[in-house]
């Protein structure tokens, strides 16, 4: 991954305005491998990278991939901008008929231990699997859509809620929730107990309004003060971000509702946010932009991760197998659900293949079915993602 200084200075304090350089030294006379990793997120169009001494090193270039390629033809761009599942999902909306479909089991058989989740999912049809891979219409006070929604199998509609500074419910609903300080201000406390208390209170409000998945915390790094979503993010420091946002996750999930850590990853620009390319060296990606995510995944086990709109070194984050499978699952051991951000430009079947389990705010069942018929996605890939989605639902009270 490159050259580093042989010496690092350590500062100790309670804030950036109150730090002291530690009067301490430690000499290591031999190399020690603390963790061995494989090449992931390799740059394709990054001409150089900065070394620890401030000099630059040239990087090899490769031919960029066609991010719009699809085995079933390019998607209509109008379908990637705010199409609500309430409009698209009417033919797929499920109403219970009182019996498990085709005489098979329902989800309560899994809950009560009569069959395993693997056995239950194996009984679902291809159309059933595809249905579960996409977002579902709002119910109750929700306005960011939900997951599940297959009553004939006993699978409920489980609703999400946005809100970087409190649980967001539309004003016309007539329900008020607490407006907490934004993430940047909370991070200025340097106090995990405060963040955990905010998360616990927000999780309680989520639960009392029959919502199950809070689309927070957002933990991308403050790379530039001009990023339009900096107020949602915590800090320019990965360690501060990981510790404090981790406490937020811990507080939220103490209510048996889910936190959604986002935007995974390197989402540092709002202009052209769905097609911008975050070009970064592997070392910078791991040590700066992915570190807070790694800390939270390993320490707090968030129920969900949200992939980001942007590309990373030429690949859409939501279609990046390196990111969503190689790093997140294989290296960090994550076992939860990954959802896309709402209406990404990624192709649904390609996202599923990469490890992005859920397409929000709606799925594209016709396109996934077409991809399946052409052999571009397998039943096994769909089952893997559906088990993660249902696994989240099964955690709820």
Task: Please report, for each region that a protein language model flagged, where it lies by residue.
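Short beta-strand elements
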Residues: 18-37
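Glycoside hydrolase catalytic-domain context in secreted enzymes
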Residues: 1-2, 8-12, 16-18, 39-397
């Amino acid at each position: 991954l490159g050259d580093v200084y042989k010496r690092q200075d350590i500062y100790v304090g309670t804030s950036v305005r109150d730090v002291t350089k530690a009067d301490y030294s430690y000499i290591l006379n031999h190399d020690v491998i603390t963790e061995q990793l494989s090449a992931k997120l390799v740059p394709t169009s990054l001409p150089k990278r900065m070394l620890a001494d401030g000099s630059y090193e040239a990087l090899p270039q490769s031919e960029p991939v066609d991010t719009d390629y699809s085995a079933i033809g390019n998607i209509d761009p109008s379908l990637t901008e705010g199409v609500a599942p309430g409009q698209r999902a009417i033919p797929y909306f499920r109403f219970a008929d009182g019996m498990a479909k085709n005489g098979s089991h329902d989800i309560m058989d899994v809950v009560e231990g009569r069959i395993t989740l693997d056995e239950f999912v194996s009984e679902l049809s291809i159309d059933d699997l595809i249905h579960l891979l996409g977002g579902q219409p709002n119910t109750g006070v929700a306005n960011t859509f939900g997951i599940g929604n297959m009553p004939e199998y006993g699978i409920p509609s489980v609703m999400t809620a946005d809100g970087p500074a409190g649980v967001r419910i539309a004003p016309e609903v007539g329900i008020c929730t607490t407006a907490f300080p934004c993430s940047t201000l909370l991070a200025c406390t340097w106090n995990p107990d405060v963040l955990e208390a905010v998360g616990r209170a927000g999780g309680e409000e989520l639960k009392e309004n029959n919502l199950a998945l809070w689309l927070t915390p957002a933990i991308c790094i403050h790379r530039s003060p001009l990023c339009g979503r900096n107020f949602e993010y915590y800090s320019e420091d990965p360690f501060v971000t990981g510790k404090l946002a981790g406490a937020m996750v811990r507080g939220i999930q103490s209510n048996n509702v889910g936190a959604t850590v986002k935007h995974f990853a390197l989402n540092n620009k709002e202009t052209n946010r769905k097609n911008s390319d975050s070009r970064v060296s592997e070392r910078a990606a791991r040590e700066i932009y992915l570190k807070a995510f790694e800390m939270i995944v390993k320490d707090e086990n968030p129920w969900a991760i949200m992939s980001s709109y942007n590309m990373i070194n030429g690949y859409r984050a939501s279609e990046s197998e390196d990111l969503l499978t190689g790093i997140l699952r294989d290296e960090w051991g994550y076992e939860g659900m990954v959802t896309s951000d709402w209406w990404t430009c990624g192709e649904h079947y390609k996202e599923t293949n990469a490890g992005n389990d859920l397409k929000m705010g709606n799925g594209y069942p016709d396109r996934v079915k077409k991809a399946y018929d052409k052999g571009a996605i397998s039943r096994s890939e769909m089952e893997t993602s559906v088990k993660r989605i249902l696994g989240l639902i099964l955690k709820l009270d």
